[in-house]
A protein has these predicted regions:
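Terminal targeting signals and extreme-terminal segments of soluble enzymes
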Residues: 1-79, 85-145
Length: 145
């Protein structure tokens, strides 16, 4: 039986500036929280997100999706989980869940591709990052094993 992927949990307190006229969090803020959780996940794997650029690569977002179930409001304390849902040689997909206590408010995903910063071309997972990203994936999804 495959092991579940590593998850990060990031706590977010909803700021007033993140809400709209209806008093709920504006939909675009969920993507910002996804980025916070994704960055935290990378840190848990043993590297900081900025190291990708230092190595001469970019991890470009090619797709994003958020499914909203309930609205978050100013002052709510939320937990945003992130995990690596798919790892392929040139692309990866992160999945997310936003909760207030036990209540799931939103789920989502972002898809990314590796790009060589010097050429702007698609490339395979950079060698120095294969091990850290493989640690995030469940064994059945690791193309490098």
């Amino acid at each position: 039986m495959p092991q579940p992927p590593v998850r990060s949990t990031t706590e977010v307190e909803v700021r007033y500036a993140e809400t709209d006229q209806m008093g709920v969090v504006h939909h675009a803020n969920y993507l910002v929280w996804f980025e916070l959780a994704r960055t935290r996940l990378c840190t848990l794997s043993g590297f900081h997100y900025h190291q990708i650029e230092e190595l001469g690569f970019h991890l470009m977002v090619t797709s994003c999706k958020v499914d909203y179930r309930r609205g978050a409001r100013y002052g709510d304390t939320l937990e945003v989980d992130a995990w690596l849902a798919e790892l392929a040689s040139r692309r990866l997909r992160f999945a997310y869940e936003v909760r207030r206590g036990e209540e799931v408010l939103a789920t989502g995903m972002t898809e990314h591709v590796w790009v060589d910063a010097s050429t702007g071309r698609l490339c395979r997972t950079p060698q120095p990052l294969r091990e850290p990203f493989s640690r995030l994936a469940s064994p059945s999804e690791d193309p490098n094993s």
